[in-house]
Amino acid sequence: MEIIKMTKEHYSDVYELWLSCKGMGLNNLDDSEQGINKFLQRNPDTCFVAFEDNKVVGVIMAGSDGRRGYIYHTAVNPQYRKRGIATALVDAVMDAMKNIGINKV
């Protein structure tokens, strides 16, 4: 598994992943490609995707208000669960938040 920063180029794969996860509540405006691109521009260092078998199998999006960090959409492909992917994504966010001076998430 490889964890990398999410970019706008990952949007279609991430959106497909979100749709594959039961109970994933999506908002037409905020979770549109344009909405996610704006979020990534504001939070370029705190959103990540997990790759395995050359495809996106996990995602985590997080942001900060300058004092606290917030974790938003976190999802793992149902066929790849129970492999530590979500834990690795959360660890990546926690490290990224620490690097930008955010200690409360």
At which residue positions do the language-model features occur?
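A short, aromatic/hydrophobic, helix- or strand-capping loop or linear motif
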Residues: G25-G35
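Conserved acetyl-CoA-binding loop-helix of GNAT-fold acetyltransferases
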Residues: V76, K82-D95
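A short beta-loop-alpha structural element at the N-terminal edge
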Residues: M1-E16
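Conserved beta-strand in the GNAT
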Residues: V49, K55-G63, Y70-A75
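A short helix-loop-beta-strand connector motif used in the catalytic cores of GNAT acetyltransferases and
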Residues: N37-V49, Y70
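Conserved GNAT acetyl-CoA-binding A-motif
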Residues: M97-V105
